[in-house]
Amino acid sequence: MSAKGLVCVVLAAGSGTRMVSATPKVMHQLAGRTLIGHVMATATSLKTSGVYVVLRHQKELISEYLTKSYPAAIQVEQDEIAGTGRAVEVSLSKIPADFAGDVLVISGDVPLMDTQTLTDLVAAHRSGKASATILTALLEDPSGYGRIIRGSDGQVAKIVEH
């Protein structure tokens, strides 16, 4: 998968206010590992040329965990809370200017995303020669989630954050 080049950006800057917890959302445990630990295990299995992790809320706690568990991760501090787009923008500014490949952006709080799904996503993106590719799911009850709104042609019309 690394023939063209791939970097991964993990979004871990959010505060997780809906969880009503003093613990950052990505640091909650699932099956003996933090949510971000599950995500990082998957991200580092993709043979990227770098995994960039965007931090803001309680960044010291998350940074300490990453430094111990994933020392090769490149930590990027988000300067202002301005949504997912700003988090991606900040991370892109840290990727070397001469990088000529694809950027895979994943959420740090989606622990069940597996290597094969992401490998297939990157392959579909590359075979379709797309500018951008978004992995989506159809949910019976999408309340509580951001949404991808599609046009009548099935293409993305807009993204609505929760």
Model-derived features: where do they sit?
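N-terminal nucleotide-binding beta1-loop-alpha1 segment
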Residues: 1-21
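Conserved N-terminal catalytic core of the sugar/cofactor nucleotidyltransferase
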Residues: 1-7, 33-123, 127, 150
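Short beta-strand/turn micro-motifs composed of small residues
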Residues: 12, 55, 107, 136-137
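Conserved G/P- and acidic residue-centered "switch" motifs that form tight phosphate/ATP-binding loops
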Residues: 14, 25, 109
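Short glycine-enriched, charge-decorated loop/helix-capping segments at active-site entrances
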Residues: 23-29
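Conserved beta-strand segments of alpha/beta enzyme cores
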Residues: 26, 72-74, 155
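Conserved beta-strand scaffold positions in the cores of enzyme catalytic domains, especially
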Residues: 27, 75, 132-134
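Conserved core of the sugar-phosphate nucleotidyltransferase
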Residues: 113-162
